[in-house]
Amino acid sequence: MPEPAKSAPAPKKGSKKAVTKAQKKDGKKRKRSCKESYSIYVYKVLKQVHPDTGISSKAMGIMNSFVNDIFERIAGEASRLAHYNKRSTITSREIQTAVRLLLPGELAKHAVSEGTKAVTKYTSSK
C-alpha cells in the first residue's frame, strides 16, 4: 500500500518568511482603515481650557471611551423617550430630556445650556 503524501513542513513560529505585507494585485499597499475617534476634538477642547497642557495616548483612549459611553447612554435614553411618546424621530427635545435624566444637577444645567447654544449657532449659520 502506498504511503500518504507528506506535505511541506509548517513554518516555525519565529520564522520571518511567514510574515508578508498585505498587498493588492497591482502591487500597491492597502490603505489602513481609519479607526474613528474623538481624539482631535478632545485635543481641541484641552487646548482651549489649558493651552500649555498635553495628553498621553492612554489618557486619550480613556477620554475616547468616556465620550463613546456618554453618547450611547444619551442616544439610548433619547430613543426610549421617543418610543414612549410614539415618535419615530429623535429631536433636540428628546436629547435635552435624556441629558437632564442622565446627568446630575449642575452638570445637566451646563450641558443643556451648551447644547442650546450649539443648536442656535447651527441654525443661524444655515
Swiss-Prot record:
The modification N6-methyllysine is found at K47, K109. The modification N6-acetyllysine is found at K6, K12, K13, K16, K17, K21, K24, K86. The modification N6-crotonyllysine is found at K6, K12, K13, K16, K17, K21, K24, K35. Glycans are attached at S113. The modification N6,N6,N6-trimethyllysine is found at K86. Pfam families: Histone. It is found in: Nucleus; Chromosome. There is a cross-link at K35, K121 (Glycyl lysine isopeptide (Lys-Gly) (interchain with G-Cter in ubiquitin)). Keywords: Acetylation, ADP-ribosylation, Antibiotic, Antimicrobial, Chromosome, DNA-binding, Glycoprotein, Hydroxylation, Isopeptide bond, Methylation, Nucleosome core, Nucleus, Phosphoprotein, Ubl conjugation. One of its GO terms (biological process) is defense response to bacterium. The modification Phosphothreonine is found at T116. It comes from the Eukaryota. The modification N6-butyryllysine is found at K6, K21. The modification ADP-ribosyl glutamic acid is found at E3. Belongs to the histone H2B family. This is Histone H2B type 2-E.
